[in-house]
Amino acid sequence: MNKTLLKSVREYKKQSILAPILVILEVLMEVLIPMEMANIIDIGMTSGDLHYIIQRGVILVVMAMLSLFFGISAGNMAAVAGAGYAKNLRHDIFYKVQEFSFKNIDHFATSGLVTRMTTDITNIQMAYMMSIRLLARAPIMIILSWVMTLKYSVKVAILFLIVIPLLGGTLIFIAKKAHPHFIKVFDEYDILNNSVQENVNASRVVKAFVREDYEIDKFHGISKYVYTLFTKAEKIVAWNSPVMQFTMYVVILLLVAIGGTGIIHGTMGTGELTSIIVYALQIIGSLMMVTFVFVMIMIAEASTDRITEVLEEVPEMQDKADAVTEVKDGEIIFDHVNFSYAGEGGNLSLKDVDLHIRFGQTIGIIGGTGSAKSTLVQLIPRLYDVTEGCVKVGGIDVRDYNLEALRDQVSMVLQKNVLFTGTIYDNIRWGDENASDEEVQRMCKLAQADGFVNEFPAGYNTQIVQGGNNVSGGQKQRLCIARALLKKPKILILDDSTSAVDTKTDALIRKAFREEIPNTTKIIIAQRVSSIEDADQIIVLDDGKIMGVGTSEELLKTNDIYREVYESQVKGGEDDE
């Protein structure tokens, strides 16, 4: 467990400290119990002193009760500390991910983050809970049991001094041999989770292409490999128990031999031999405990590295101390912008983009697949940072803004529309959680969503399930547009967000934009010329470069790319969807 992860203990420090203290008290009682048993046998029973037997018996029962109390209390404290620690870790990772830029998120697969927040944190929780309890218990038990053994027999104590390091070393060797296999197992868990996630998310595609058998075989292959790796690790760990059992029986035989000789010669009592055997079992049991915890820590170590990787990831975008907190207007300037997803030295996705968009204008962006249309607009709310040049909003470099303030004034409807589990009201209110029902309904009317929403039996209280699988693609797009409008932003970006909407509805949405939100800068990325031909300016992108800027009429005269797209759609006819 490293310093980064231990910071998440926070309010559970008290339980984390009390658990080992209670364990030590429990161990103290357990170590004293065999001594009292020896006294009862060797003194009370030998002399036939019933009063002594009862007196010591009462003390024995009290010790047992105290041991039980301390043990239960320690277990409760350890459970609370472990569960609380895991809760804090999940919170810290989730909070950290919220701070990530797109570039940070690109470092981790979604399935990898899910595995970290579930399986990995559970492993760490178990290791932490065992560590604060068992790692305190085992060493104290071994030391005190050995000291008590030394009190009765130096020979037996020396025997333990030989056995303990040999056995401990063997068990640690076994655990270390298993560790690399556990690391591989958890790496494969990511792949397994990714396979499940892909299959569930794309279940309709799988069924449409009748690929169920292929997906089953793929999942079976990954699952079998995880099974093979885990089996290899467990086969190594399985040596623990036989080694411990063998050692235990050998030690007991030696103890009986040494103790029997002592009893015959009168140098050791029967009770003392009984106590020594109990101490031997306590020492061996403690070594087994240490090994078990050590194996768990080995498993958790792989998880620790993966969790630490997320927590120590430095968010690429951080607010300056004097960050600007107010966006004046929706004017946008791209000043000789170059951008590469790989950073400096990588292949440029945007090349020397120089652009001025006035506040309140409607801008259309068109270009072929891979021309960096989405990349261009993602720089405006600073989802990525430019590699060279700068992007200004309201006359200020976006890097000088407080991120929350900037993004609060930029509404973006992404290509992949996402709705969340909850009612339609809940989903639209992502734009403004304090919005009234009337405001939500008004924005849905602007987005041409009000009609189909009112056709649902529950209207705006209709539950959205599984990311919006109970609404059509066009309906989902309109709900996402309504959500974006509810923010009342200074800049509205539609990234191919009306592609599943028929041309008539598309035209009504654009008309609503012109009439109802004239003081919002609107950027519309589209594949259909009809979606942008009435824009104030149209930007033609090709391979990350601006190949033309102007109205539809101007571009038809001066730009071959735009003219080719326009003519192919007009002559071919646009399909109403």
Predicted stretch roles:
Residues 21-22, 29-42, 50, 54, ...:
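Juxtamembrane helix-loop junctions of ABC transporter transmembrane domains
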Residues 11, 15-28, 60-63, 69, ...:
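Transmembrane helices of ABC transporter permease
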Residues 20, 24-32, 65-72, 124-127, ...:
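Hydrophobic alpha-helical transmembrane bundles that constitute the permease/transmembrane domains
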Residues 326-577:
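ABC-type nucleotide-binding domain
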Residues 48-55, 144, 148-162, 232-306, ...:
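Helix-loop-helix
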Residues 47-48, 83, 91-115, 119-121, ...:
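Short intracellular "coupling" helices and adjacent cytoplasmic loop segments at the cytosolic face
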Residues 11-14, 99-103, 119-132, 136, ...:
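An intracellular "coupling" helix at the cytosolic face of ABC transporter transmembrane type-1 domains
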Residues 1-30, 37, 45-60, 74-78, ...:
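Membrane-integrated ABC transporters
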